[in-house]
């Protein structure tokens, strides 16, 4: 049986995909991790009885999920990667698949420091910093990382009944994304590059197509 949970993370996205058999988990994949905050100005406060919001990591615990076969990050907006740290507190991950992996031993990006950058550029630094910090502060929780080049569609068949494709949107942008992000971690702060990429960073995203024959 294929089970899809669209997790109510508030202003963000996170989806849990599981194949279950006899109450046992045969395969589990999380697509995105939601925001790092549930409290938003345009939503009811958390003490409101109508609120059913939950962090993705807390939802995984609630469902008894302690291991993910695959974690897919479609892009690096805060409402998609902000909850990564909480997810890694809750589960171990066999594979992380995304469009960019930070350099080994990368340090903080300090988005709120005295860098003279405009808001859009700082926002890009902040999003990537949250992502990299979550990986850095949870060593050993992810067995391996796969940076998808965008050159080909990834086909996976984790079980006989379940297969899926990870499709890359506008793969020509992936090398540029890597160049801009790598420069960040080298301490370079190109105002134009950061502003430009901050406005189009969701263009180089991933799309998932599921096939189930259970």
Q: Which residues make up each language-model segment?
A:
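Metallo-beta-lactamase
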Residues: 68-79
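Conserved beta-strand hairpin/beta-sheet module of binuclear metal-dependent hydrolase folds
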Residues: 1-66, 199-214
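Conserved Rossmann-like nucleotide-binding pocket used by diverse enzymes
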Residues: 5, 72, 97
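Structural motif
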Residues: 27-29, 67-70, 95, 166
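Flexible, acidic/histidine-containing loops and adjacent segments that form or flank the divalent-metal
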Residues: 1-2, 81-214
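Flexible loop/turn segments at secondary-structure boundaries
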Residues: 13, 38, 80, 105-106
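A generic structural signal for short
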Residues: 45, 72-73, 196
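Active-site-proximal beta-strand/loop segments in catalytic clefts of secreted hydrolases
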Residues: 20, 32-34, 74-76, 147, ...
């Amino acid at each position: 049986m294929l089970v899809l949970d669209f997790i109510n993370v508030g202003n963000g996205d996170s989806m849990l995909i599981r194949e279950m058999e006899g109450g046992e988990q045969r395969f589990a994949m999380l697509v995105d991790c939601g925001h790092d905050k549930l409290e938003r100005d345009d939503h009811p406060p958390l003490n409101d009885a109508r609120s059913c919001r939950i962090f993705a990591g807390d939802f995984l615990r609630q469902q008894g999920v302690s291991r993910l076969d695959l974690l897919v990050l479609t892009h690096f907006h805060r409402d998609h990667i902000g909850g990564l740290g909480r997810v890694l507190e809750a589960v171990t991950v066999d594979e992380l698949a995304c469009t960019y992996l930070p350099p080994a031993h990368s340090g903080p990006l300090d988005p709120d420091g005295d860098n003279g950058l405009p808001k859009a550029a700082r926002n890009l630094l902040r999003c990537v910093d949250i992502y990299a910090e979550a990986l850095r502060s949870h060593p050993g929780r992810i067995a391996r990382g796969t940076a998808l080049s965008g050159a080909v569609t990834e086909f996976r068949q984790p079980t006989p009944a379940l297969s899926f494709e990870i499709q890359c949107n506008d793969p020509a942008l992936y090398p540029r994304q890597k160049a801009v992000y790598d420069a960040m971690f080298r301490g370079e702060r190109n105002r134009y590059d950061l502003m430009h990429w901050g406005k189009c960073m969701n263009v180089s995203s991933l799309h998932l197509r599921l096939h189930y024959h259970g």
